[in-house]
Amino acid sequence: MEKFKKKLVEMCKVNVKAAVVFIILALFLALLGIGDSEGDVYLLAAGIFAFVAILMFGTAGTKKKRIKAQLREMEEEGSLQILYNDFSYTGAKFSKKYQVAYGRRYLLDFAAAKEGFRIMDLQEIHNVFCCNMVDGEPQETIYIALETADGSRTLVGSAAKMTEEFSGMIANLKQITRLNGGAQWQ
């Protein structure tokens, strides 16, 4: 159970490369600003880049704390055991890149929820498909759309382009919903 909880907390995505780039830019600009008559501009820009990098790391830390709090609450209620049972079989998938994890019955969306993660019952999902429309507007980003029998849709797992992993997630989710009696678009 502890390994499972740790894996869920690690689903919180931190763009370390981007944060490191901001820190390097901040250091470079600070070095340019030292001893220069117009150095104040460089130092100000360095401060802004450093602040953005700190925000990136701080946001991830806050999100991890929220996930841990949600897990503690679920453990106290006894509902964490249900998730653990679903994700303990070998076919469960965890994608930190797309911030989605799913087992045979439940899908966990780590991107959308500000307070930890959102739990979706896959037995309520009637259809799974790839979507690039949000509120009727076309998007460059593609999503996995989960549709219930009443037609309501939830978008999870955003991607800039279709990858093998993303396509595989859609195929797996389609198979799971098909087993649950859902219809699929071809």
Kindly give the residue locations of the regions a language model identified.
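Anionic N-terminal interaction surfaces
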Residues: E2, L44-Y102
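Short, Lys/Arg-enriched, disordered terminal segments
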Residues: M1-V14, W185-Q186
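Phosphoinositide-binding peripheral membrane targeting modules
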Residues: G103-V134
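Short, flexible helical or helix-coil boundary motifs
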Residues: N15, L27, M74, G78-Q81, ...
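Charge-rich, solvent-exposed alpha-helical interaction surfaces
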Residues: K7, Q70, M169-N172
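Acidic, Ser/Thr- and proline-rich intrinsically disordered linker/docking segments
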Residues: V128-Q186
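Short, exposed beta-strand/loop patches in secreted or surface proteins that constitute
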Residues: K97-Y102, R118, A145-E147
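Alpha-helical transmembrane spans
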Residues: L8-A69
